[in-house]
Amino acid sequence: MSGQMFKVEIVTRPANFEKLKQELGKIGVTSLTFSNVHGCGLQKAHTELYRGVKIESNVYERLKIEIVVSKVPVDQVTETAKRVLKTGSPGDGKIFVYEISNTINIRTGEEGPEAL
């Protein structure tokens, strides 16, 4: 197994997902996983209507995007995400970078960067 692998996890507002996906494609990111999540942080509480009752909440909808790269430099992925997602306001999100020790393709049995 050769080649270093990294997982980039981005938690951000869902609004710019399509733009981010497009820009990541331009640098060679061919696949990613995303899921809807909820979170709270520095943003102020907002008022929601729940079953006819107004409630204040500091929980916001977010998107978690997971990308594992080997051939694409991880710095390019993080710089692209920062460029696309930064508004300068609380709630822009966070980027986490992890080293990956192995990847296994269940269907083919390939391991390491070849499994990506």
Swiss-Prot record:
GO terms for molecular function: ATP binding; enzyme regulator activity. Keywords: Activator, Cell membrane, Membrane, Transcription, Transcription regulation. It is a peripheral membrane protein. Disruption phenotype: Cells show no growth phenotype even at acidic pH. InterPro entries: N-reg_PII, N-reg_PII-like_a/b, N-reg_PII/ATP_PRibTrfase_C, N-reg_PII_CS. Gene3D superfamilies: 3.30.70.120. Pfam families: P-II. Induction: The nrgAB operon is activated by TnrA under nitrogen-limited conditions. It comes from the Bacteria. GO terms for biological process: regulation of nitrogen utilization. One of its GO terms (cellular component) is cytosol. PROSITE patterns: PII_GLNB_CTER (PS00638), PII_GLNB_DOM (PS51343). It is found in: Cell membrane. PANTHER family: NITROGEN REGULATORY PROTEIN P-II, NITROGEN REGULATORY PROTEIN P-II HOMOLOG. Needs to interact with NrgA in order to localize correctly to the membrane. Belongs to the P(II) protein family. Required for full induction of the nrgAB operon under conditions of ammonium limitation. This is Nitrogen regulatory PII-like protein.
